[in-house]
A protein has these predicted regions:
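Intrinsically disordered, low-complexity regulatory regions
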Residues: 1-49, 64, 73-77
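Short, charged, amphipathic alpha-helical segments
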Residues: 55-62
Length: 77
């Protein structure tokens, strides 16, 4: 399983800019498990059309990934 997004070579700069935040090698194993699925999906999305909606989709996916990671880290009340 890759630890960084690996889409096609020609990415719009805004797509590449967001895609970098899906890397997960720096995370501890229990967070890599959560993040890797989002990285895989982000790579698939980035391999599609290069337009503003792709960037929007990746930003929203990034927001979901961040929430999923925080859910694992949640200490409870």
């Amino acid at each position: 399983m890759p630890d960084e997004p690996k889409p096609k070579a020609t990415l719009h700069p805004s797509v590449a800019g967001v895609l970098q935040f899906f890397a997960y090698a720096h995370l501890p194993p229990h967070l890599q498990e959560v993040s890797s699925a989002f990285c895989d999906l982000a790579t698939r999305v980035a391999a599609g059309p290069q337009n503003t909606e792709t960037t929007v989709a990746l930003r929203k996916l990034l927001e979901a990934k961040d929430a999923a990671v925080r859910a694992v880290l949640f200490k409870g009340a």
